[in-house]
Amino acid sequence: MQSKYGRSSLKIKNGDDTRTLRALSFSKDSVNSSSFDNEAASTTLGISTAIHASNRPFRQDEYSWNDCWMRWGQLRRVSSQLRELRFTMNDQPATVTSIAYQGTLLVAGTSSGHVLLNDWRTNDFQILKPGLSSNESVTLPVTSLAISNSKRIVCQGHAGGIIFVWDVSRKPPLQLFTINQHSEDSVLTHLVFNGNSDDVLLSTDHLGKIAVHEFYNLVINKHCTSWNLDMSKSNSLNLDSIIVDTSSISFEELHITGVKHFSFVVLQSLQSIQIVTLFPKTTLIYEFKYPAGIVSSACHSFSSSIVHKNGENTKLHAFFATAYNNNLRLYSVTFHKGYMSLQLMDRKKFAKAIWKLWWFPSSSIIIILFDDMELAFVNSMSLDIIGTSTILDKSLLRWDWYSNSLAAIGVSQTVFPFISSSLCISPRYMFVVNSETVSVGSFLMVSEQLQMLSERYGFFDSIKFGSYCVSNLSIFPKLLLEKTSVINLIMALYVKLLKSLARDFPARSPFEATSQKTNDYELEVQHLFTWTCELYSENFNTVISSFIIANSLGILPEIIEQIIPVFTRVGKVYVVLEALFDLILSQRFTNPSPQLQHHILNYLNDCKRLQDMDKLIPCIEYQSLDLDFITKFSRSKGLFDSLCYVSIYAFNDYSIPLVQFLNLLKSDIDSPSEETSINVEKGFHFLLYSLTGMKYPLGHSNNINDAYVVIHTLLKVIFSVVPLPFDVPVDNSVDFPYLRLFLEKHADDFFRCLEVAFDYPYFSLEKVTIAKKLLDTVNRQWILECISQLYEKKKSVSQSYYIFVSHVTANYSNQLLFSQSFYQGILDGLCNIDVPDDKREVVEAAIEELLTVYEHFDIATTLLSCWDHQLYQVILHISFKCGRYEDYIEAILALWKQKGQKHSFVSESSEALISLVFNNLQTINRFPGHRERYVSTLISHCGDLFAINHVCFVRNSLKYLLDDFTKVITKTFSIKSIRLQFLSLIIYEITYEQLSSWYRERTILSFLELVSFDQGDVKMLELLRLHPKLVRLQGLMEILNKNDCIESCIFVYRELAEYKLALSHVSKYIEKSMSVFDLEKSDDMTSRRIERLCLHLKTVVPLFEQCTKEVSAEDVTNFWLELVFTLLLVYIKLSLKGSINSQITFKDFQQELSLCIENLLDSFLSKTNSYKIALNTVLVRICEEASRNEHSDQYLRKLLLKLITDLYINHDITKECFLLWDMKQFYEIRSTLLQNASGVLVEDPKLQKNAKGQYTSKLKVYFSGLIEREDL
């Protein structure tokens, strides 16, 4: 189990710090893991245990508290008042048509035109009977009501467009005046007062007309001014399209310290929502248009404003919610210097259409009325539904005139099928008017909801809902949530739940038999708890989850105090203690009471879980610790981490853990054990933390003064020359008794701690103030002198000492001053200790660091020691720095011999090693005379370096040693095995001039002969193309002919302008290649050879033209015939193979060969077109060959036809051709060869002649093959 309080990233040892504990501790992936998280809690409770942080939404189908938000009933008082009204009206029926509520004042309008006035504070009831005069009363239904914020003014609107204004503060109420701003055929749907003011009233009717009424000095002169709201100049929406429902219009006014600041009207339609200011003039300040589509419902609501003051830059913030169809949008509204800005905060889409929005007074809860009369309570911060309710009576008030008015403005009745004043909401109640009476729903307090849930459904839903409410206090109105009572109720539920779970866990009794056999209490509890966690994981997770939630509510100590006696009485207290152990270890519960600390520690002690105890105590807040008990307990049990925690965090006394640490070192020397070794490792963590200004074990920073005091005190104790009055058994007869404890067995860890601590600012100071005294610091110089003084008297010295001194002296060279003998001793120690392979690199780095401050050392002795201990890196450093280049190259070679070893520096990078040798030439130029010696040494080992990586060696030699390259070549010539190999590498990197200046022709020819013999024609051709001047070497052609390098010969002859020889070798190359080809096989090698053949075929015609520039026609004819018939033999051989039809590679070559022959014919004809003897010779030779060789007959006939067609040879010359073909075949083939005309006329000797001996007709041969006679 890993500690939950977090270890520092500084590690004393490289080993894994994780401990494997017994099965009693929570380990691996068991269900009772000590890293128990919120997901495990949710497995049992069904809700995130971090609900106070995540505000997880409740799903309606998952929880059963939805019907516990409101308690519904009938408003009997209004029903009795209606009966009384009916009695006074001589049995005329009357129903409630509208309702309004403000504070304790409830008014209900009736269908008879009366208003029922109820003051719940005084329990008074009155009937307001409006009249136009003393003798004329109004009997039209009351369709809208409004109560001012002061509860002094009541306004009632009627179906005839009349508004009556009452002063209800009078006894009896006084009708102030009547307003007739609306037309007589209109129905008033809204009466809205301006926020907190009694001065301005807004009224609307079902025709979409809006009127503003301003009241002045109502008490004195009862003056009222009314005017219609004219929006024509503001280019806004058509007022006729305003929806006649409860959310059509609202009138808001925000205040700063009681002074009117901003007033605006919100106008709602099915197309958009607009915000308009009235003063000083009507102005449209914001408009939001709904997305295109059919909108069947739209509504809005404003929250109460929040005032922020900041000097003159006062800003007002409010929240605005609007809904259309099933979409809800939430805005943040800001008013600043007369300007309004809206910012979209969140949006959500519900499954049902929204009809109405209310912002719950003084809270962050939005109440939504859906189209099915369901109410949803929504958290405005996340737009998640946290509860639902259902209206008791869904048959809301419906009037025929209302439906008719909706139809008149083209609005479907499904939009909102009830009138505006049929619903009313207050902080405690919701009133709903139906056709018979008034339903009232009271919002239950959270404590009432919890009580109802626990009675109906049990613990879980009550606990979940109560936890959510307490954890989200900001969204609930204070009127409904009394935190103290809710928490007390939750605590009682938790206690009841946990007590019910106690009977489900096994007690110790089933394991008594096991205990008697083993007589081991630890093993008994281990078996018991392991078995419990396997079989009762769900119940155990429930216990932990309950503890987590209870702790988040601050009631865990009280719950534990009540349940521990219950679990103890039934022998199952181990369940509670293990759960608490898990919570404390995971830092979820950090302040257990002293009694609880005793319980848990004694339980762990009985189970002999010392490591768990040592991890548990630092997880408890030190202010809550029972210091005396914990201190004694930690000392007696040897709990090092706990003792450090108590001493440093509670007492601020570092001497206790230091003394304990020294005793641990003594114990580890005298009688080592695994437990002691673990605590010693913790002790070095303590030392490292303390010397670097941190508190152990939590890793908190000490303040700077305390850190200096701690560091100073620890160093004074550790480096004390004589024993101090501590309870540490040390030898009094030796110096530095405490330092010896560190160096006896744990020198590596001690020096590592000290080296890290040397970076702390304390060591850079000369003086520090301790106990109000200015004292000298314990500086680095003095510490090193103390350690060196101790080691001078010891025979064996730890290598970590030498490494430590090397690092420190190099890092703080400006602050340390030691003698040369001191440095020499350190250097001798580093060079002469036996170093394992895995530590050699560390020692080499330490020596290099030491040599940065110590320069006057014995070079020869040091190098000899390094050679003895194979410290090749040090040899490289010293030898190069001191100009001992022979040692340097020898060390390079020795490093290469180490390649492949486990801890080899070189590994497999030979290129890096060679590059290192040559890169030194860039820096060595700064030292006069050193370059010559270094180059000389390098050249002397040329063969060895060449063997490491010959390619890299040659490349770097040409780059850095070009001026001395003759010496390199001379050295390579002395080694026969690499002479030609060296030349084979450099020939690709140098010019021909360099090659000829460094090598004789005989050597070059020998190299070329070797290349042609070993690597063949292709490699030889590559060299000749790289260095074309090689073709002039005497004897080159003999070498090429000897090794049958035909392609190279072709290249040489072309370079020497011997075109006839080049052409003959091309023919030879083609014949040779075709003789070795397997025409039945097509692979990559064959494809590449065919490509090369095609390239050579393309050179035949240019070479032929070069050969026949100044040659007689007869010689051209003979040469042409010899060349063409050589190529024809190749073509015939390809034609004999039927497989070529399926081999694309050979088919391409055949086409290329045919094209070459035709191009040769074109070239020949261009030179001998006027020489008839040559033409006849070619013609006869082709005919003879065609007659003699049946395999070439078809191709030669086509060639002959091409010859005849291209030359337009007449009948006298073509008569020999008729020996080969019949007439029709001749003309058909010939017609296919002509490309520039539709046909040709041919004289036929078999046709009759006229009297004058002339032919009377000719044959017309078309290229399509059709033959026609044409009369002349």
From Swiss-Prot:
Localisation: Golgi apparatus; Cytoplasm
Signal peptide: none
InterPro entries: Vps41/Vps8, Vps8_C, Vps8_central_dom, WD40/YVTN_repeat-like_dom_sf, WD40_repeat_dom_sf
Keywords, sorted A to Z: Cytoplasm, Golgi apparatus, Protein transport, Repeat, Transport, WD repeat
Domain of life of the organism encoding this protein: Eukaryota
GO cellular component: CORVET complex; cytoplasm; Golgi apparatus; HOPS complex; late endosome
One annotated GO biological process: endosomal vesicle fusion
One GO MF term attached to the UniProt entry: zinc ion binding
WD repeat extents: 91-130, 137-176, 183-223
UniProt keyword annotation of Transport present: yes
PANTHER family reported in the protein's UniProt record: VACUOLAR PROTEIN SORTING VPS41, VACUOLAR PROTEIN SORTING-ASSOCIATED PROTEIN 8 HOMOLOG
Function description: Involved in the retention of proteins to the late-Golgi. Plays an integral role in the complex vacuolar protein sorting process.
Family, similarity comment: Belongs to the VPS8 family.
Record protein name field: Vacuolar protein sorting-associated protein 8
Organism: Schizosaccharomyces pombe (strain 972 / ATCC 24843)
Top-level taxonomy: Eukaryota, Fungi, Dikarya, Ascomycota, Taphrinomycotina
